[in-house]
Amino acid sequence: MIKKEFKAESKRLLDLMINSIYTHKEIFLRELISNSSDAIDKIYYKALTDESMIFNKEDYYIKITTDKENKMLIISDMGIGMTKEELEENLGVIAQSGSFTFKKENEIKDGFDIIGQFGVGFYSAFMVADSVTVISKALGSDQGYKWESIGAEGYTIEPYEKESVGTEIILKLKENTEDEKYEDYLEAYRLKTIIKKYSDFIRYPIKMDIETSKPKEGAEGEYEEIVEEQVVNSMVPMWRRNKNELTKEDYDLFYSEKHYGFDKPLKHIHISADGAVRYNAILFIPEKIPYDFYTKEYEKGLELYSSGVLIMNKCSDLLPDYFSFVKGMVDSEDLSLNISREMLQHDRQLKIIAKKIKEKIKSELELLLKNERERYEEFYDSFGRQIKYGVYSDFGQNKETLKDLLLFYSSKEKKMVTLDEYVGRMKEDQKYIYYASGDSIEKIDKMPQTELLAEQGYEILYFADDVDEFAIRVLVDYKEKEFKSVSSGDLGIEEKDEKEEQEEQTQGSKEVFAFMKEALSQKVKDVRPSKRLKNHPVCLATDGDVTIEMEKILSAMPNNQEIKAERVLEININHDVFKTLKEAFDNDQEKLKIYTNVLYNQALLIEGLTINDPVEFTNDICKLMS
């Protein structure tokens, strides 16, 4: 027996793999199981091309056994095995893949998948083991061999009597440290958890001897401990099954088992795609918003599998931010992985899959909106805010994709409507899509600024979410109809005779408004007669792009930029209050100053804004009452 050195920068490369390539030590088991699956696949492929061979899938499995006394973990398979030369070539050269060579030599193309494309997964065993022993007998060979190594120093190969074809890997686990309990890898529960997480859908049975209890024969009420062999993996991924054979209960159970949420999914989307990139996916739209959805702890992304082996728990690149609420998984045989099998080597395939998934989610939401309106509104109640974020984020580049998924409360319908529904029933001469912003539907419904539009039968969209107005500012228009706030200076509905009448009424009142503007100093841009008020005496309007509601939202942000709306105090000249203002202007201008401040503060309160000096406000009211 001669000790040999590794051929590929030995210590440096092995140290790099053990310490840098893999994120979690538990991944070693995934790699070794994947190698065992590859070995059985090779027998299957040979049987396809060799009529003298019979391959019965039920006869092949992978076995995990433990020896707690000697701290050994054994992974064995009934695969194709390795000759002495193959042991030296595949295990003696780091980054030499036997699966890759086999695939190349046999010209295996589409339709047959071998998981291992690199030759480094085996060496992940050294993350948890002081020494690794491989006992293997190749198909068609009379002699078995034993390969042993304690790490970067090298390895030995010697003949070994092995009865059956296949490979056995024996890991002598490391001693426990403060940071890692290596003996946990000898516990059945820990091993089953790792297998379920990463290798549940390996296509061959993974068997373990599990200790369990059963009623003792002839002794009522007594139990005895027995050890029985159990299959611990599912083998057949749900996403590869025929959709028509699956029920809603099947999908709900999968959602629960994968711990995607504590609720039930509102909708599932099952994709089986062939084309430039082949992939399967099962996606879920949750029924309720996750408790941590709007926190920094929330991670978006889908589980990513490569040929049934879990590669990433959360692949964020598969979902745009505006669909970050979607849960589920994607499995593809066409991904190019890096040597740790944990990350993508390049993302061309992933971008194709992500684009298709985005389009599918959108189309399914459109169908839900069209065919199951009530369920869509349930979804929108939970996740509509995220859709609106999607409209205005990234400089509006997604607004065309998302605009038809938006819903807003309608003053006329008293329910949620789409922009298309609103525009479809606009008056023939209507120039704008009207909206009103506020803290709640109830408060918006009472806004003085809506009086004129409501009286003339115009439909108003109510924006009660702080992101609404930002979204439509980015949207700009819908079907060539611009959005217009009910607080804007020009509502675009004034008739010529109305304009002449108002000008006539206000001719003798200009001095009153000028005095009031002076009294309010820098608080408002202007004081003017209102064209929109019918019953209320006063309201705030705005000139410019920033509305009162936008000012409130921006001022509440951490990086308060002191962005202010150009406030205009509007007075209803047909209200009795205006007569009082005119009388005060003619007879007691000090009282007019008090009236002006009271009306301005009243307008602030209606808008939900803070009064700068509440004490002065209450004193003014008392003065007027005394």
Curated annotation (Swiss-Prot):
Pfam families in UniProt: HATPase_c_3 (PF13589), HSP90 (PF00183)
Gene Ontology terms: cellular component: cytoplasm
Subcellular location: Cytoplasm
Annotated segments matching region B: 342-552
SUPFAM superfamilies linked to this entry: ATPase domain of HSP90 chaperone/DNA topoisomerase II/histidine kinase, HSP90 C-terminal domain, Ribosomal protein S5 domain 2-like
Function: Molecular chaperone. Has ATPase activity.
Family per record: Belongs to the heat shock protein 90 family.
UniProt-recorded name of the protein: Chaperone protein HtpG
Originating organism: Alkaliphilus metalliredigens (strain QYMF)
